[in-house]
Amino acid sequence: MDRLSQILWRERELLELLAYKLEVERLVLASGRTRWLVNATREIEVLLEDLRATEVLRATAADEAAEQLGLTPNPSLAALAEAAEEPWRGILLDHRDALVGVAREIAETSEDAKGLITAGYRSARETLLAIGGTSTASYSAAGAAVADAPRSHLLDRSL
C-alpha cells in the first residue's frame, strides 16, 4: 500500500503540473502570441509521456494492493479504499478526491483552450475568405486545382 500511495502522490504532482501547463497554453492562445505555442505544447507532450509511465506503475501497484486485499486485478481506487483498513482507507480516499478534482480542472482548461483554437481557426478562415475569394479549397475532389474567378479591385490613386 505504501508503494501505491507514493505513486499516487507522484501522479497527483504530475497532474497538477499538467493543469498548470495547460493554463499557460490557454493564456498563450488568449494573448494571441502564438510564437510560444509550440514550446507550451512540447512541454505538455513531455509531461504526458511521464504521466503515461506513472499510470503503468500505478496500475501495477494497484494490482499488488488488490491481491493483498483479496480483490480482483484492476480495481478502482474507491474499491481499494473500501477494502482497506484505516489509515489506508482515508489516504486512498484523499488521493481519489484530489485526482478527481485536478482531472475536472484539466477538463475545464482544455475546453477553454479548445474554444480559443476554434475561434482562432474561424478568424483565420474568415480573413482568408475576405482576401482570396469565396472558397478556401485548393483542390477539387478529382485533384484539379481550384481557382476563384479574378476579382476587380478599386484603387484610390489620389493618395
Predicted regions and their residues:
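Short terminal interaction segments
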Residues: 76-159
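Extended, charge-rich alpha-helical scaffolding segments
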Residues: 1-79
